[in-house]
Curated annotation (Swiss-Prot):
InterPro entries: DUF211 (IPR003831), MTH889-like_dom_sf (IPR023129). This is Uncharacterized protein MJ0319. The lineage of its organism: Archaea, Methanobacteriati, Methanobacteriota, Methanomada group, Methanococci. Signal peptide: none annotated. Pfam families: DUF211 (PF02680).
């Protein structure tokens, strides 16, 4: 099975649990090979984090359930990669600023 191989999420979460705990909880799910969490904004009570998850045949509903059980809210799905292999994004002339 191929299914979803990478998903990138923008998440708002409370300061607790720590991102280390969130990463370990997510990696306990089946089919997840790795998790990368980056904090890009901190407010008084919350953190905005970018979560990149890679694996094979990822179950978005399971991932969302874990995030919500830890007090997180998914703001957006910023990238999804599916299929037999991961295709990296290619820059085009439209991407220039």
């Amino acid at each position: 099975m191929n299914g979803i191989r990478r998903i990138v999420l923008d998440i708002l979460k409370p300061h607790e649990p720590k991102i280390t705990d969130m990463a370990l909880k997510l990696t306990s799910l089946s089919n997840i090979d790795g998790v990368n969490i980056t904090v890009y904004e901190i407010d008084k009570e919350t953190e905005n984090v970018k979560v990149t998850i890679e694996g094979n045949n990822l179950d978005f509903d399971e991932i969302q359930e874990i995030i919500e059980s830890l007090g997180g809210t998914i703001h957006s799905i910023d990238e999804v990669v599916a299929g037999k292999k991961i295709i990296e994004e290619v820059r085009t002339p439209q991407d220039r600023h």
